[in-house]
Design a protein with these regions (language model features):
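Extended compositionally biased segments used for macromolecular assembly or nucleic-acid engagement
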Residues: 34-38
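Charged, amphipathic alpha-helical segments and their flanking helix caps
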Residues: 1-25, 29-31, 43-137
């Protein structure tokens, strides 16, 4: 069996969030339909710390992207969704329910959801996130 990538394991974890209406999360792809979700890796220096024994503390940063309906009233709902998602991630850390990445330390949101782009009827919101894990030498 082929081992899953770390970003795929992150996607699997996010798909367990009860706030997602259709439950399906893509990687580096978001549909133009509302209630579409994607995990989009962002380029960062992966090594946070190198240890004397050769082990390392590493990070993956990514955006959780949400395609949502866009209007004055919908924007209030979308803002609440982003806040609720942030709280869900926080609660998962508290109970140690994390992505199934070996050596994982945490997953967290680095900010609230903000609008990346809009059309007349939809908006893409992004929530910047980080996973930190340790790798032995």
């Amino acid at each position: 069996m082929v081992e899953k990538s770390k970003i795929d394991l992150i996607r699997d974890f996010i798909e367990t969030c009860p706030l997602l209406n259709n439950g399906k999360v893509n990687v580096d792809y978001i549909s133009d339909k509302p209630e579409s979700y994607s995990v989009d890796e962002t380029p960062v220096e992966p090594v946070l710390k190198s240890y004397a024994d050769g082990g390392r503390r590493l990070q993956i940063q990514f955006d959780f992207s949400i395609q949502a309906s866009f209007s004055v009233l919908e924007n209030i709902k979308n803002s609440k969704f982003c806040d609720d998602f942030l709280n869900w991630v926080y609660e998962q850390n508290k109970i140690d329910n994390l992505p199934k990445i070996n050596g994982i330390c945490w997953i967290k949101c680095l900010g609230r959801g903000t609008i990346l782009q809009t059309t007349t009827t939809t908006a893409i919101y992004v929530i910047p996130m980080q996973v930190v894990y340790e790798e032995d030498f």
